[in-house]
Amino acid sequence: MSSGGLLLLLGLLTLWAELTPISGHDRPKFCYLPADPGECLAHMRSFYYDSESKKCKEFIYGGCHGNANKFPSRDKCRQTCGGK
């Protein structure tokens, strides 16, 4: 296969991976953790996946500790955990 064909295949696979919805079986376990603002006093706009509503929601992160269910953007939350 030519290098152009390989690039096209790679591009199509990447697009497919981005557009394929995440099922509950593929979702990382930390997506089911509750929002945890942590113990520090920073005021950082963050997002977490709410497994009950199946949506990425905004919360304020304090800047330290907390858990892995926090994302810098709604898009990153959706890419990792799915949701709306």
Swiss-Prot record:
Entries under PROSITE patterns matching the protein: BPTI_KUNITZ_1 (PS00280), BPTI_KUNITZ_2 (PS50279)
Main location: secreted
UniProt xrefs under SUPFAM superfamilies: BPTI-like
Location(s), subcellular: Secreted
Domain BPTI/Kunitz inhibitor: 31-81
Domain of life (superkingdom): Eukaryota
InterPro entries documented for this protein: Kunitz_BPTI (IPR002223), Kunitz_BPTI_sf (IPR036880), Prtase_inh_Kunz-CS (IPR020901), TFPI/VKTCI-like (IPR050098)
Role played: Serine protease inhibitor that has activity against chymotrypsin (Ki=4.77 nM) but not against trypsin.
Protein name listed in UniProt: Kunitz-type serine protease inhibitor B1
Annotated organism of origin: Daboia siamensis (Eastern Russel's viper)
